[in-house]
C-alpha cells in the first residue's frame, strides 16, 4: 500500500497536495520516491526550506545544534542560536530594529497586527487584493487571493479595507471615502505578491507605501 493510500485512512482531507507521490529520500533538487524513481523538484523544497535536500552546510549546522540541544523554550532561557540569529537579522535590516520569532508566517502576521493596533490605538487594517497571508482567522481576514479560503469562516476580523496592488494613487480615495488615515493601524503588503501571480511591484510602490505610512503614523507590515 502506498503512502498516499495509507494517508487516506488516517489523515483528514483538510489540505490538498499537488501530487500523490510518497518520497523516502532527497538530494540536491531531486527526491526519491517510495517506488525508486528520481524526480526533479523545481522548487528544491518549499517555503523557508527551499535550500535543496541534504545540503551539506545545512546538515552540518543541524548536527552541531543537535550536539548541544534540540529545543529550549525562548520564554524561559536564552540560547546562543536564538540570540545570534536575531543579531544577524538586525544587522541585515539596518541595525535600528528588533526581532521576535514566531512559529509561522500566519502567527507573525497576527502578532504584527495586534502590535500595530496596540501601539497606534487604531482599528483599521488595509490589505491588498490577491494577497495571501495565512489561514488563521486573523491572517485569513487580510487574505484576498481565493474566496475558498474564507468560505464557512465569516464573519472574520472587522475593519479590514482592500486596496489594489501596485497602485499608489488610490490611497487618496481610500482615505476620503472608506477609512480616515488616523483610523488605520497598519497597511500589510507582500514585497512580491505570491498567490496573486508572483507580481513584482514597481520600484516606487513600496517606497510610496513607506511614505504614506510615515506621513500618517501608520505601521507598515
Q: Model-derived features: where do they sit?
A:
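Hydrophobic "anchor" residues on beta-strands that sit immediately upstream
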Residues: 37, 186, 218-221
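Short acidic, glycine-rich surface-loop motifs adjacent to enzyme active sites
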Residues: 182-198
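A short, flexible beta-alpha/helix-coil linker loop
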Residues: 45, 68-69, 168, 191-195
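PLP-dependent aspartate aminotransferase-fold enzymes
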Residues: 87-186
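Active-site-adjacent loop/helix segments that line or gate small-molecule/cofactor pockets in enzymes
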Residues: 1-27, 81-82
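Catalytic PLP-binding core of fold-type I/II PLP enzymes
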Residues: 181, 199-221
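Glycine-rich loop-to-alpha-helix module at the N-terminal edge of alpha/beta enzyme cores
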Residues: 9, 38-122, 126
Amino acid at each position: 500500500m502506498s503512502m498516499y493510500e495509507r494517508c487516506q485512512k488516517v489523515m483528514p482531507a483538510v489540505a490538498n497536495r499537488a501530487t500523490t507521490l510518497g518520497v523516502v529520500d532527497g538530494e540536491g533538487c531531486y527526491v526519491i520516491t517510495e517506488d525508486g524513481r528520481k524526480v526533479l523538484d523545481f522548487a528544491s523544497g518549499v517555503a523557508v526550506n527551499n535550500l535543496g535536500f541534504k545540503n551539506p552546510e545545512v546538515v552540518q549546522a543541524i548536527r552541531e545544534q543537535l550536539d548541544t540541544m534540540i529545543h529550549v523554550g525562548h520564554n524561559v532561557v536564552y540560547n546562543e542560536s536564538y540570540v545570534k540569529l536575531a543579531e544577524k537579522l538586525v544587522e541585515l535590516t539596518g541595525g535600528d530594529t528588533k526581532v521576535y520569532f514566531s512559529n509561522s508566517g500566519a502567527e507573525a502576521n497576527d502578532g504584527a497586527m495586534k502590535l500595530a493596533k496596540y501601539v497606534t490605538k487604531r482599528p483599521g487594517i488595509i490589505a491588498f487584493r490577491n494577497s495571501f497571508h495565512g489561514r488563521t482567522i486573523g491572517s485569513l481576514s487580510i487574505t484576498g487571493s481565493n474566496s475558498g479560503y474564507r468560505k464557512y469562516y465569516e464573519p472574520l476580523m472587522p475593519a479590514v479595507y482592500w486596496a489594489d496592488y501596485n497602485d499608489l494613487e488610490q490611497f487618496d480615495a481610500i482615505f476620503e471615502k472608506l477609512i480616515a488615515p488616523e483610523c488605520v493601524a497598519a497597511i500589510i503588503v507582500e514585497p512580491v505578491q505570491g498567490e496573486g501571480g508572483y507580481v513584482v511591484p514597481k520600484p516606487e510602490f513600496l517606497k510610496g507605501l513607506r511614505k504614506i505610512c510615515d506621513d500618517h503614523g501608520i505601521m507598515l507590515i
